[in-house]
Each structure stands twice: as C-alpha cells, then as structure tokens.
Amino acid sequence: MKKLTAHLLVAWFAIFVSQVSADDHQGNISPAASTGQIVLVYHWPCADLNRGLSVLRDMIAYESANSPHKYSAVPAVHEDGALASIDVHGSQKSMDLAIVWQEKDETWQSYLSEMASACGSVDDLTVKALEIN
C-alpha cells in the first residue's frame, strides 16, 4: 500500500510539475492585435484633460453604437499627460471606411469639435498607424 501511495504521489507530482511548466509557457501573453489589423495611436496635448477624456469616452460609446464599421477603441492618457486613444481596425480597408463614416457623420464631428474646445487645435492631434505583421 505504501508503495502504491508513493507511486501515486510521484505520478501526481509529475503531472502537476508538467502542468505548471506548460502553464508557464502558454497563455501568459496574448496578442494585442492580429496580423493584418491596423492599430492607431492618437496623441493630443489637452488643456482640460478631464473634459477631453469625458468627451472621448462619449465619442467612443457613440462610435460603438452607430458606426457601420466595426473596430475597437479605448481612451488613454499618454505618459506626457496628453489625451490618447488606441483604435484597432480589422484591416486597412475597414479603417478607411470608418474614417469616411467619421468625416460624414455630423454627431461624430460635433464630438471632435467638443474635444477641440477642451484640448486645443485639431492641428495638434497626431496619429501613429501600425500595421500588424
């Protein structure tokens, strides 16, 4: 009986160790985006950051409910204190279609104007586009 218990204990320990090792190498880091997606990182120095963030959150909620082109977006604050947004589009084409929609949508444009009143000139808004490989 002691021998069987010892073998079971060793077998259980071996399974546990192999599972812990497998867990150490699987699932710790998941991709932030997939191949072919476009990630946009917006940066806008903002005089009234709290108001800018509030308007940006409202804008993202509006986009989520109304954009005919699916993408994800999240508000953020850049390390230098600027207002930021990170958008992930499924493809270049999807991004282009979303931009056309934004340019034509009056409500979206009003959010942009409201952010400009909180943050300053739209000319100060910059964007970095990353194509995921």
Where are these regions (language model features)?
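Short S/T/G/P-rich N-terminal loop/turn motif that feeds into the first structured element of a domain
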Residues: 19-107, 117-133
